[in-house]
Regions:
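Acidic (Asp/Glu)-rich catalytic clusters
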Residues: 89-93, 111-127, 154-162, 220-224, ...
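Conserved, mostly hydrophobic/aromatic
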Residues: 16, 99, 166, 232, ...
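Histidine-centered catalytic micro-motifs
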Residues: 11-24, 228-234
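Alpha-helical scaffold segments that flank or form the walls of functional sites
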Residues: 27-120, 126, 148-161
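Mid-to-C-terminal alpha-helical segments outside catalytic/metal-binding sites
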Residues: 1-15, 27-64, 68, 72-78, ...
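H/E-rich (His + Asp/Glu) clusters that bind or coordinate divalent metals
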Residues: 254, 258-379
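Divalent metal-binding pocket/active-site signature
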Residues: 161-274
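A gly/proline- and charged-residue-enriched helix-loop-helix capping module
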Residues: 127-149
Length: 379
């Protein structure tokens, strides 16, 4: 059912997303579809085109460009249109104010943040992925003490370098239950990680003694610098165990007095949106979004916003797409997200829970104002 509230004129501050791939060989079939689902199972490619989200995305992008609403027609259009023209059209139509980019999800064939800003014509700010930074420091250090010292030093100058926030993917490295660890426990596990880095030139930080210790170090520095820390929560790529990614697993960190000054930003949250909303209602330093559910759940976007707002204050809900690699994801996130938010705000007005002015103010807050204040983004 169409909404009577039009949010298209409110520019979005996308507080969690990733960069785009640089132009290469034209994408076809499975190579294109893989960006529109979280699965890495190659046998799922044939099924992605039958998801409600993918079918809706094709129709929406086709309507914008005036082509037939089919995968074949869209891929032909992509191949025939200069990449910069194609991307700018989607970002303009999506009406984005600025992008906060997690730079830890980037390959050699991706744009850097400056290049991305030039391409899309919007400010692009940096979010540091903590695990990526930790892995680099492990590879570059001789002792574990050097890793800790280097991590603290990097985070103390992060804001001066233009970094606006931090991000953890602990959910992908064993779960969100971050336990207290001693320096001695972490140092004892360091040699094995260092040997892996020496042998292969890189290391994947999954040892929880080291990760848990360094995450607490990072949170201490975030508290001092007043840097928001994003946590991947709930669903995502298929290498995360959804059972250990419930946001309630973070409670020990949230109630720790040492971290009460750290803004915790819980990303995605689906299907634990109510649990995340509960935490945002309890703790002043907890914020949430429903990115990835917006847009992947398609018609479920309204339900995601509805569940988030059952308990969470409007001032605690942020907007993000979690889009990456291809510009269609950004456009779909903006379009479907605005529709879903407008529909729940419509309902709240119709049910005499909010008045029209309150609903419009809520939309402004969720789509950009809350994030601008939290991350200290001007304008």
């Amino acid at each position: 059912m169409p909404s009577s509230i039009d949010l298209s004129g409110i520019a979005i501050l996308d507080h969690h997303c990733h960069t785009l791939l640089q132009p290469g060989a034209p994408l076809i079939g499975d190579g294109f579809r893989r960006f529109f689902a979280e699965t890495t199972d190659p046998h799922m490619a044939a099924h992605i085109r039958h998801t409600v989200f993918y079918m809706r995305m094709l129709r929406d992008v086709a309507a914008l460009f005036g082509c037939a609403p089919s995968e074949e027609a869209l891929l032909e259009l992509r191949a025939a249109t200069p990449p910069e023209v194609y991307a700018r059209r989607l970002f303009d139509a999506g009406n984005f104010r600025a992008l906060l980019v997690d730079t830890g999800f980037r390959g050699p064939d991706s744009y850097d943040t400056h290049e991305l800003s030039q391409l899309v014509g919007r400010p692009v700010e940096t979010i540091i992925r903590l695990e990526t930074l930790m892995e680099q420091l492990i590879a570059a250090s001789v002792t574990f003490g050097q890793v800790e010292d280097a991590l603290r030093a990097e985070l103390r100058i992060a804001r001066a370098r233009g970094v606006v926030g931090l991000k953890s993917i602990a959910a992908y490295r064993g779960g969100l239950h971050v336990q207290p660890r001693s320096f001695e426990q972490a140092a004892a596990a360091f040699p094995a990680l260092k040997e892996t880095a020496r042998r292969y030139g890189r290391v994947r930080l999954a040892d929880r003694a080291v990760l848990d210790y360094l995450l607490r170090v990072a949170l201490e520095e975030a508290a001092a610098a007043e840097l928001p820390v994003q946590f991947h929560v709930a669903f995502g790529d298929d290498d995360a165990d959804l059972r250990s990614a419930n946001p309630l697993q973070l409670r020990a960190l949230l109630v720790d007095e040492a971290f009460r000054r750290v803004p915790f930003v819980l990303l995605h949250c689906y299907p634990y949106v109510r649990e995340a909303g509960y935490l945002a209602a309890l703790y002043a330093h907890v914020f949430i979004d429903v990115s990835l559910a917006v847009p992947l759940t398609a018609h479920g976007c309204t339900a995601a916003f509805t569940e988030a707002l059952e308990l969470a204050p409007i001032s605690k809900l942020l907007f993000a797409t979690d889009a990456h690699s291809v510009p269609e994801l950004f456009y779909a996130g903006a379009l479907h997200g605005r529709r879903g938010l407008a529909q729940i705000l419509d309902r709240l007005v119709d049910d005499d829970i909010l008045n029209a002015a309150q609903a419009e103010d809520a939309a402004e807050a969720i789509l950009w104002r809350n994030a601008a204040g939290l991350y200290q983004i001007a304008g």
